[in-house]
Regions:
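Single conserved hydrophobic/aromatic residue that forms the stacking wall/gate
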Residues: 1-7, 11-12
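Beta-propeller blade termini
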Residues: 29-38, 87-109
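Short, solvent-exposed loop/turn segments at conserved positions within beta-propeller repeat blades
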Residues: 54-58, 122-125
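Beta-propeller blade repeat segments, especially FG-GAP/WD-type strand-to-loop junctions
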Residues: 57-75, 130-135
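Acidic, small-residue rich beta-repeat scaffolds with periodic aromatic anchors
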Residues: 100-225
Length: 225
């Protein structure tokens, strides 16, 4: 892993840093990156994520160092202009994610359970659960279930409801256990992944040696078990 990372971080750092480590011209509460091997193929992925705005929207770009040592941005199945899952923790620079692995067409598939909290309208917030997996170099989202929290009552008391993406109504317990039940039905194995997120501003404008240390700090903290 270390050998692969050395080549990968050189690619990310030296030849491609200006592609992803840039200042953005709009305000965001969070703008961070992390390194990981999401699909367990020995090639490092770079995730660059930002979150903020009145709708609390999140957007993430996924990059992969290919076998030729080039950094390429992966395609995704996300809908344009829609909020994407919140991959960063809102409080900590470190995050833990539940992962379910199974075999699809003879290949290992790693499904990361992720959540997205957003303001859908002035009186409605939603909290949805989905999974992300890299399938043939495409970041693929599987939408699972959603919680609606509405404040139409004159006393501003919340009305909460739950449903899956087929529109079937769920209880609170069914919603909270939906991802586990969905993947257990596929006989998937459960794992945990740990990520360390670092502010993009920390790596903008620094020397290559400093950038190497920062990248290594993120990857060294990454774990999967």
């Amino acid at each position: 892993i270390t050998t692969r990372l050395v080549g990968s971080e050189m690619c990310i750092r030296d030849r491609n840093r200006d592609k992803w480590a840039v200042d953005i011209d709009f305000a965001n509460e969070q703008y961070k990156f992390t390194l990981a091997d999401l699909d367990m193929d020995g090639q490092v992925e770079l995730l660059v994520s930002h979150c903020g705005g009145t709708g609390i929207f999140s957007y993430t770009s996924f990059y992969k160092v290919d076998k030729d040592g080039k950094l390429k941005e992966l395609d995704t199945t996300f809908s344009e202009y829609e909020s994407q899952p919140d991959l960063m923790d809102s409080v900590s620079d470190e995050s833990d994610v539940t992962v379910y692995s199974n075999i699809i067409n003879g290949k290992g598939c790693y499904n990361y359970i992720v959540y997205d909290f957003m303001k859908e309208s002035p009186d409605c917030y939603i909290y949805r659960v989905s999974s992300l997996a890299i399938v043939d170099d495409v970041v693929t989202e599987t939408k699972l279930a959603i919680e609606y929290e509405t404040y139409e009552d004159p006393d501003y008391e919340a009305t909460i409801s739950y449903e899956d993406y087929n529109g079937t109504e769920l209880t609170e317990d069914e919603y909270r256990t939906y991802a586990a039940r969905y993947y257990e039905a596929q006989q998937a194995s459960e794992h945990r992944a740990h990520f360390k997120w670092i502010d993009v501003s920390d790596i903008v404008g620094v020397s290559d040696s400093e950038a190497a240390q920062i990248l290594m700090e993120s990857y060294d903290a990454y774990s999967f078990h």
